[in-house]
Amino acid sequence: MLNSLDLEGRPQDTRVVVAMSGGVDSSTTAALLKAEGYDVVGITLQLYDHGAATHRKGACCAGQDIHDARDVAAKLGIPHYVLDYEDRFRESVIDNFADSYALGETPVPCIECNRSIKFRDLLKTARELGAQALATGHYVASRRLDDGSRVLVCAADADRDQSYFLFATTQEQLDYLRFPLGDMTKPETRELARRFGLAVADKHDSQDICFVPTGRYTDIITRLRPNAMDPGDIVDLDGRVLGRHNGIANFTVGQRRGLGIAAHAPLFVVRLEAANRRVVVGPREALKMHRISLRDVNWLGGGDIDSAIGNGLEMFVRVRSTRSPQPAWLRGAGGHYEIELVAGEEGVSPGQACVFYDAPSGQARVLGGGFIQSAAAKVASNPARPLVEAVRG
């Protein structure tokens, strides 16, 4: 008989490691599992410790958050460990973040953190502790199939859904992970935290880039990859120089504000050319892309991705975390994959993720995804014809 986590055995005989960041979500996750009788072990990762960040509202995995996680664990009466992952985090996440901006991309550090720190290194530690599962406070859900494997689905709370940031989770990792908050709303989580008497019940949510102490990501870029802040030209689609900029890392595709140039009509960043330090701008209609080339594709749709695609697989894709899934076709084989957007999308930026879903809304299944490498404005009439790239990473 399976318990509430779809695992064999009674809760009291089932050890679960909970990744505790010190926030309300992971704290409530630990409290829920403890209340259900599981053998809960809390682990908090020390990822960075900028002096300015440790007491900032919304900081994560440093300073005050570690103390909050320790206090919650003490109240729940569960073992709690703090692991120093600063070196791993710097190498896998912060350096990657800076490199991506230097290439003219707009990275999503949370994806890399989940992929390389939480769901690889921490998962390994959980296994070494004899845990049958690793639970997190993410707003996403998983469902058990008849064969025992699991599928990733969107959270019940669409406003909090974090599936975009978890597309790179492997099937092996997914089978070991549990997301107890996936069918709850944020207000319900906070109310539960109050019932459990957790001091973090009304704590502010974490920020998008937890390791940026001042809120200015360019400070990190300037320190780690100063060449990304070298000045260069702002040009139009025909290459005419319209002005100068103070570093491509200050811009992202689709940006309108802060260009510092005068024009009769609104201009937007269409692409960033890192090799020659050029920011290319154009009218809004130049932003719409219809074809996306992907790298590092992760498939969660079951079976072999090439077999699933065949001559083309219809799906829905999200090209930014704040966007709604849009109809698209996935094509390709042998590690080379492209997305054809039925209606096109604006602001498609290299470095962002393109996440696959089987439905446009509700608790849709996550089929995987990849990182955007380049994009083109029009779909070629001949599939074998090379892309004329409009956006290049």
Swiss-Prot record:
Q: Where is this site: Interaction with tRNA?
A: H138, Q352
Protein family (similarity comment): Belongs to the MnmA/TRMU family.
* Reaction catalyzed: S-sulfanyl-L-cysteinyl-[protein] + uridine(34) in tRNA + AH2 + ATP = 2-thiouridine(34) in tRNA + L-cysteinyl-[protein] + A + AMP + diphosphate + H(+)
Give the EC number(s) listed in the UniProt record: 2.8.1.13
Annotated protein name in UniProt: tRNA-specific 2-thiouridylase MnmA
Q: In which residues is ATP bound?
A: A19, M20, S21, G22, G23, V24, D25, S26, L45, G137
As recorded in Swiss-Prot or TrEMBL, the protein's gene is named mnmA
Q: Which domain of life is it from?
A: Bacteria
CDD domains per record: MnmA_TRMU-like
Query: Which Gene Ontology CC terms are recorded?
Result: cytoplasm
